[in-house]
């Protein structure tokens, strides 16, 4: 039982400390120089929209408020069967740089596939309708593409307003890891709020996968780097409702695991080296980490009385999960936003969402069509 417990303990540590450890090791390597250019390439900015009447005009205004040369920008807004006033609002804008596609409801991935066919420029920039971008963000993204080995550049998403302390801590750790991984190698994938990729690398997105993961890893699949630019900043709100957030995480986990399966070629360390290990650690092991955690918890409960060390570890785990439960019960109160409750609660929510996602995958459950997450 002792050997079993420590084996499981090692697996758990790998699931959750593996990526930060890889980031630390990667950060020790000599940084690879990226020659940036001031010659701006043409950008096609693509926004998939579903019932975005409250935000779409702001998205248009925010995009053209960028300091990027206006003649180098094309904005494609693709409506995925919107039933509100989104179409009317976009059509009211007569700017020739705007291309509006009023498509039937087929889901976000099909909408993006259709939009790319109308792209006039070589660099595709994907961003969400409810996300605001900093005036310098487009210039920051575009400047990296003077290097032939750079295929994709991810922006730096920052929460404003809503979102609990646990989620914020998660994003801070993720941002730190991306900075170190990007110095001399490649990050795992981009976040959908804002990222850019060469049009020549794009392939149609399959149904049922996370679009940002699939699109960005097309770069690594074709032996190009995925960089992170902390100065390409975008802003957006978190999701207040715990039920909505849990459902969103389940949906993302299901689509993310499907995406890894579709991109399983890049999980081969013989061909893709450390990137393959990095990808498996971040996108598979972390999402399924609840399995070894649950098994080792029951093993630990069986051997807790045999050693003060095991008893201490067992008590620590109980305390952690009790703090998570308290965070759940206080989630709509100010006290529930404290890190001591919010962080354990967020971690446990991610664990359970991974298990539920695995359940859906085993049963081949079809998730509902994409509906944007909104902070209402």
Q: Language-model features: where?
A:
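Long helical/loop segments within the catalytic core of UDP-sugar-dependent glycosyltransferases
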Residues: 104, 109-111, 127, 135-209, ...
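A conserved acidic beta->alpha catalytic loop
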Residues: 62, 79-87, 104-106, 131
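Short aromatic/hydrophobic "clamp" motif used to bind/position activated sugar donors
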Residues: 124
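Catalytic donor/gating beta->alpha subdomain of glycosyltransferases that bind UDP-sugars
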Residues: 95, 145-154, 158-174, 207, ...
